[in-house]
Amino acid sequence: LLNPWALRTLRARLPHITLIVDAGLGAPSHATAAMELGMDAVLLNSAVSQSHNPVGMASAFRHAVQGGREGFLSGLMPSSDMAVATTPVGGQPFVLL
């Protein structure tokens, strides 16, 4: 995705319009990213038809789209430039098992 900011902005400004990404998706992870940004669907052709295993690639995209959409609907946590501890560990020993 060349401009995730633009897709995020479109979703925010057009919350009740169906938004579909129809170009630039070459890997299942790209579809996940589009769906996590709030897109309603993706259109695919070359990424599936030109793969070495189109049936397997179609399955991978199906799972990627489902996961991305479910993540968006579940409410992704905001991204951060720094790691932020969310587990209270103050005064507790920390042991890796």
What are these regions (language model features)?
Residues 63-97:
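Extended, intrinsically disordered, low-complexity segments
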Residues 23-24, 70:
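Aromatic-residue hotspot detector
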Residues 12-23:
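Short beta-strand/loop segments at the ligand-binding rim of alpha/beta enzyme cores
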Residues 42-43:
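Conserved beta-strand positions in the central sheet of alpha/beta enzyme cores
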Residues 1-11, 27-35, 49-64:
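Active-site-adjacent beta->alpha loops and helix N-cap segments on the catalytic face
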Residues 15-16, 47-50, 69-73:
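Short, surface-exposed, polar/charged, turn-prone segments marking secondary-structure boundaries
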Residues 23, 46-47:
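Short secondary-structure boundary segments
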